[in-house]
Amino acid sequence: MAVAAPGQLNLDESPSWGSRSVDCFEKLEQIGEGTYGQVYMARETETQEIVALKKIRMDNEREGFPITAIREIKILKKLHHQNVIQLKEIVTSPGPERDEQGKPIHGNKYKGSIYMVFEYMDHDLTGLADRPGMRFTVPQIKCYMKQLLTGLHYCHINQVLHRDIKGSNLLIDNEGNLKLADFGLARSFSNDHNGNLTNRVITLWYRPPELLLGSTKYGPAVDMWSVGCIFAELLNGKPILPGKNEPEQLSKIFDVCGTPDESNWPGVTKMPWYNNFKPPRQLKRRVKEYFKHFDRLALDLLEKMLTLDPAQRISAQDALDAEYFWSDPLPCDPKSLPKYESSHEFQTKKKRQQMRQADEAAKRQKTQHPQPHGRLPPIQQTGQPHPQIRPGQPMNNPHAPMAAGPGHHYAKPRGPGGSSRYPQGGNQGGGYPNRGGQGGGGSYGNAPYPQQGRGPPPPYPGSGMAGTGGPRGGVGGGYGGGSNYPQQGGPYGPSGPGRGSNYPQQGGSRNQQQYGNWQ
């Protein structure tokens, strides 16, 4: 297999995809769904290998193959890294798919379907975090964050922006390996940032301030803001910026990170939408105050990730070199992490929905068929035992008491020196379910959110992405994005960022710390 040098994409890898039928696979269970279609866990009938099948929805496409799917396939064919999801092949269904009665699913009886075949991952980070009683240890958080940053650094040095980093797009297997997934909104970029890009990307809770202020010239720093939100969420136990709409999202960012001005973000006043959302009063930066219960080194790294000015935001490479990853407790070996039952956001949301529906049905049943009121027992004479009281049971508590229930080693040398900031040029112009608070803000007036910039606005008020059904971007399950916005348009070797392997040796201590609701 040809190998791409750093900074270049592998253009020589060209397998004969599309030659096999989806009939080579047996669908086992649906694990994701979004505007793109469905994702299934499936088994290859010949090898018995478990894979993920992502169906590309074609019924709404008037101009042929969806542009987001084309971009995702082209990018994933060229990215080969242990922390990036592997696209194995493309398969097709030669004719119309049929339902249980044998009728074609699509209106056009001649239309087939196209599937992307991915390696199967047992969990996504959202589904794993939503497991009842789940508590991530500090070594586990460091392990996941280090893998996330390593995969993202590989994308960035190959001039690829992910543009939709969130928990449901971070897939984890039972060997502890984390992989970046869902490249439906990803695109290549140039270091000069001369081209205009759409600012209608990245799920709302993880969207950086430069995009919310209308920037169309941006670079890798947008992904690093999303990583900072994920990092704080892991430490905090819930999302830190759960805005309902774009103005409220900016309000929450300013409450935590302070008001941007020319002193802390040169050029911000020239942003297209700055005057629309300029707060009535100056707010100071309060990251350390909001997250004072975090470890000092964790807080220092978070400060650099949640920097308002994208030109001053830390890069993935320099984040890997932060003292946080080199202090006790060290990141654990991925293989040492516990194994869990399969947990995807789609599945956990489906279970919660079923529980809610069952509760609502029980309430309706109780309302429609109320229990008849029983008559009061006759007055008893003094000394006569109550007919409903058993011997030895107190008169003031006639009911019997009820029993209460219990409650991979990276081995990378220290990366090359370099600035910990992104270049100044080009940046000046630019799901998890809501377990957090109920919005705030409201201090930016009643003006509608401006519609300048490339790309269509979200069709529903308060939605983070088109067709996603909420700020988290729906239930894509990691293999597929919850958006179908039209966008503008070598294997990673052992040498790379960071200071080498820092996993503790066997027998070493692994200090357990607690952050909020997480251990």
Swiss-Prot record:
Pfam families: Pkinase. The lineage of its organism: Eukaryota, Viridiplantae, Streptophyta, Embryophyta, Tracheophyta. It comes from Oryza sativa subsp. japonica (Rice). The modification Phosphothreonine is found at T35, T198. The modification Phosphotyrosine is found at Y36. InterPro entries: CDK, Kinase-like_dom_sf, Prot_kinase_dom, Protein_kinase_ATP_BS, Ser/Thr_kinase_AS. This is Cyclin-dependent kinase C-1. Residues 426-444, 464-483, 490-499 have a biased composition (Gly residues). GO terms for biological process: positive regulation of transcription elongation by RNA polymerase II.
